[in-house]
């Protein structure tokens, strides 16, 4: 009888805790601990968050008022041997799940498989790069898209095309938006900037990169180019969560390179399902992202190139979006251009910019690059 009372009280306590959690987890709490997600509209996230609160409240009420008694009755009659068998079965199930998840090729849980087109291959320092010297016609967002890459893994206009490292160039580093996911070459942001400025654009961007990886890619490639005119990268609050992940190569305080750390796959899956971030973790990533972007700007300027950070915006800026932009870009006075886009300017059933979105971003980039940088160097007249 005593075991029943203790179990019943514990279950009622859990139910009350769920009710209190649902009450305390207001919108401000959600905004502080669950970051924007690129693939989802904010209104979808708000609905999901409110649904979770309602489910927690209903579950807590049901447990405290209805289910606590029958569950306590069952548990109080259970034998030690029976409970051990259940525990063993649970551990075996978790172990089997971990083995099954590890059978898949490892890649960050927030990134696509490296085998999806355009294919990527592992890289010990960057995490992954596009497979070099390759062309493919892929089906992306319901359309056929041609991708071609040179021997260095830069996206190029056509098979066999190469990048001339001696020419004046605008260098683009970033992720799939910069790389032109779902767009043929001529419609990508770099290609449109090239057409507007009459200057070679070089795409160093690789799908699913964080800001750390984008910087590392630039640092590795920049020494090859003799006349870098500008370096363009991307920052989006809805992609900021990637910068918190240690399961890809990343930069620690002081720009110290760290290899990827692969935790238990079940833990990764749990974090993917419930992407809760502590205030301390977010603050560390704000500081780290700011340090990385400052280093990128300094690196570009050390070669006489202009640096520009592009901030595309599909939806009205939320309080979290504004906080991240202010803390990461405004406070250190980094050079950036915010590009507000029509919410409909994205690929079908996909959040990447379509031709209209890419055109608007490219126009903003071209306007932001100082005209004097586009002039050919003057030669001294012969004496």
Protein language model annotation of sequence segments:
Residues 170, 179-256:
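Conserved SGNH/GDSL esterase-like catalytic core that processes O-acyl groups on lipids
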Residues 4, 11-53, 70, 234-329, ...:
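Serine-dependent acyl-ester chemistry module
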Residues 1, 6, 349-383:
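Histidine-centered active-site loop/cap adjacent to the catalytic His
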Residues 77-103:
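Internal/C-terminal transmembrane anchor helices
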Residues 53-87:
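Cytosolic-side transmembrane helix boundary signature
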Residues 211, 215, 286, 290, ...:
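Short, amphipathic alpha-helical "lid/cap" segments that border enzyme active or binding sites
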Residues 103-196, 344-346, 383:
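Membrane/wall-proximal cationic-aromatic binding patches
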């Amino acid at each position: 009888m005593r075991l029943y009372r203790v179990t019943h009280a514990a279950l009622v306590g859990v139910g009350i805790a769920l009710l209190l959690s649902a009450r305390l987890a207001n919108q401000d709490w959600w905004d502080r601990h669950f970051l924007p997600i690129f693939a989802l509209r904010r209104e979808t996230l708000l609905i999901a968050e409110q649904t979770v609160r309602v489910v927690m409240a209903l579950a807590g009420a049901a447990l405290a008022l209805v289910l606590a008694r029958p569950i306590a009755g069952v548990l109080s009659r259970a034998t030690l041997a029976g409970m051990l068998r259940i525990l063993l079965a649970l551990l075996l199930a978790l172990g089997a799940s971990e083995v099954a998840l590890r059978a898949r090729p490892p890649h960050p849980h927030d990134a696509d498989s490296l085998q999806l087109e355009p294919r990527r291959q592992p890289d010990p320092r960057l995490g992954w790069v596009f497979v070099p010297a390759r062309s493919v016609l892929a089906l992306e967002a319901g359309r056929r898209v041609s991708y071609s890459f040179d021997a260095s893994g830069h996206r190029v206009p056509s098979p066999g095309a190469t990048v001339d490292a001696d020419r004046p160039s605008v260098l683009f580093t970033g992720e799939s938006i910069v790389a032109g996911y779902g767009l043929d070459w001529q419609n990508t942001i770099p290609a449109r900037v090239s057409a507007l400025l009459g200057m070679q654009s070089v795409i160093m961007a690789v799908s699913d990169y964080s800001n750390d990886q984008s910087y590392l890619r630039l640092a590795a490639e920049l020494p090859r180019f003799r006349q870098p005119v500008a370096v363009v990268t991307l920052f989006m609050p809805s992609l900021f969560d990637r910068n918190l992940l240690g399961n890809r190569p990343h930069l620690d305080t002081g720009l110290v390179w760290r290899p990827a750390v692969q935790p238990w796959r079940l833990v990764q899956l749990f974090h993917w399902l419930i992407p809760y971030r502590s205030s301390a973790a977010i603050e560390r990533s704000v500081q780290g992202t700011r340090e990385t972007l400052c280093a990128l700007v300094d690196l570009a300027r050390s070669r006489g190139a202009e640096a520009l950070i592009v901030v595309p915006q599909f939806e009205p800026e939320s309080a979290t979006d504004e906080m991240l932009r202010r803390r990461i870009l405004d406070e250190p006075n980094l050079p950036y251009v915010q590009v507000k886009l029509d919410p409909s300017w994205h690929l079908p059933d996909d959040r990447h910019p379509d031709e209209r979105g890419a055109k608007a971003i490219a126009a903003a980039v071209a306007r932001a690059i100082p005209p004097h940088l586009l002039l050919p160097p003057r030669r001294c007249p012969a004496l």
